[in-house]
Amino acid sequence: MKTSQTLPICTLLGSLFLTAASTVEPVNFFGRPYRLASYNQKANAMWEFTAPNETVTNWTTLFTIVDRPDARTPPDLDRLAQGILDAYKAKGGKVLLAKTMKDSTGKPYNYIVVGFDQPAQKRFELNFVKAALGPKNAYMAIYGVRVTDPKDYVAKAKAFLNERSTEIGKELENKKVPALETLPRREF
């Protein structure tokens, strides 16, 4: 097939994503709007929201929602949390906190904080994860932060954790994610 014949298909697919992404309301986190930047359904449907002027390949903060239809009960949620921990550890993450908590209504959720040391980029990536049961099944809400400092990024990341981790945890606890069935999905 000639390139000139494939270009319209690529253009069409790109415009379909832009149309779907543009119809999704931004997710607000700490009063800052995050717009849908990517979504896929590889293993589980996942939507990544970026702050203004950032992309999924070049971000300093990222808000991600993952649909987990495989978890529908509290024991399923515990297994999901263990799987999250195992996956992060397998990718070199250092688990800084893993705890079952209760929201203001008394509903339990799992809260996990994981750090990734990225010395080549002189940064520490921190993932704050809430795994909870929604109306139909579990979901994960992940707030990612990349802390960078050319002189001492590790010290800056520690200071960030000391100063901000409590408020990030509270913001995640109270965060209402969009109804997952309203978010775009790719048809295969």
Predicted regions and their residues:
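A short, surface-exposed beta-strand/turn
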Residues: F124-A138, G144-V145
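Surface-exposed amphipathic alpha-helical segments
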Residues: Y139-F188
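Bacterial N-terminal signal peptides
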Residues: P8-L16
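Signature of long, low-cysteine stretches enriched in small and polar/charged residues
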Residues: K89-K130
